[in-house]
Amino acid sequence: MTANNEKPELIPIDSGFSVLYKGKYLYSKRSPQKNILQVISSIVIQSETLVLCVSPVLGYGLKELLEKLPTDSFALGLEADEELLKLSKNKIDKNILEDSKFLYTGTDSINILLKQFDDFIKGKKIRRVIRIDFSGGAALNQSFYSQAFDFISQYISQIWINRLTLIQFGRNYARNFFKNYYSILRSILKSPDKSSALNINSCFGSLIEKSVNRPIIVIGAGPSLDSSIEFIKENRDRLFVLAVDAAFAGLYPEIRPDAVVLLESQYWIQKAFIGITDLDIPIIADLTSNPSLLVKLNGNKSFFFTDYSAQDSVASSFFSVLKEKNILPLRLEAMGSVGLAALALAERLAFDGLPIFHTGLDFSWGQGFSHSKLSYQVKNIFSDISKIKSLYTGESLFPNKLSFEKGKNGSLAFTSPNLKNYGELYKKLFASKENFFDIGQSGLELNSKKINFDTAKKIIDDFYSCGGVVDLNYEA
């Protein structure tokens, strides 16, 4: 949080107070309340709206805003400057600070803000967010406030995307969950070791947190994987290779993953494993993943659980009971992307500070393809070519709602709304992680810690030469 030796000074004037801080008046010297009251009087607030109140300082306008809010709308006060926060909490009416429709938070951390915001909106329906700057204090941390607004907007959007996904796929998720859970219970009953019945959780596999002590590379199936293959081959023996389901077939046999992450709930994912179901490679599977495929795979299986029910209070309470009774495996936030799930798993598996590389997480199209040329999706396209069926159909060449967005290294990336949303989730969850390194040379701009292959190799070399302790402040 922004702090300094300078203190904000209250300046008495005829109609109240202004604040002098860092050489600037944060309110008008003539009528400090006039501007904000005019804004609140003129603004239209729809139902199910969150109002982001930036730098409220003396609280002018908050009372009028809360009176104007629809019954199903709320206000979030945000202050990033420590000195202004102290002044603000002393000057704002306690009735406002204690109002159930208002949350006042002081932080300059997006992660802390989103955590407090998530707690605040539990059980509430928020469809949109609007921003109101309550004082000149908004200009002191303009970049952070803009970022906060963008992240909150994206957060709300993700909530509704999850709800729509649940409407479309919820029945399938639930069916798969109970089929897989029942299969685990049956394995307990058939086990000669009856003591396992006393600990159902042990049958979810050996997914032990902080159990990997080698640098991890998460391999997605995006186009950037193609340029990373040689690097992975050269350093294979020094890496823990965690591959997503769609990339597995293209890697094997030259690169045998240490584990494969399976997330997909629909039957089509079985195509990605044709001819490779009996390789005895460990599988880390979501309990909602396709049960028919899980039965065919003969590798050791560990399970995790994607919290797809977070927006459904009844289902969420059911899973909470399972968790309390310790009969639910590792629980992850619903992200919708197997690549993001693999990153979350890698973070759980790794010792603190262990380097985690990733490639193939482009969240965009490459030259003609949405996936790596090694992926089963691209191989499937080529296998379907015939005299009367070309490589590209209209929909595959020009998918619906594609757009150009900012790509890595100043380039443009061709992406879709869903892929762009995954990219925004990456920014929220992983972009700020010091030990995460992006070696993918193409794709959507993720604000990730991008490095080239030489730098990645140096990090690995340093890890082994320094006994597992490395300086994470590398530049490409």
Outline where the language-model segments fall.
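Active-site/ligand-binding-proximal alpha/beta "capping" segment
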Residues: S292-F357, L361-F363
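N-terminal donor/sugar-recognition subdomains of glycan-related enzymes
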Residues: M1-I216, P223-F240, Y252-P257, Y267-D280, ...
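Active-site gating loop/helix substructures
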Residues: N300-I327, S383-S411
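Long, contiguous hydrophobic alpha-helical segments, chiefly transmembrane helices and signal peptides
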Residues: G61, L65, A75-G77, V244-D245, ...
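Short, composition-biased local secondary-structure segments
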Residues: P215-L225, A310-S317
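Catalytic or ion-translocation cores adjacent to nucleophile or general acid/base/metal-coordination motifs
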Residues: L239, A243-D245, P253-L297, F305-A310, ...
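Acidic, contiguous segments within the catalytic cores of piggyBac-derived transposases
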Residues: R348, G368-D384, S403-L412, S416-P417
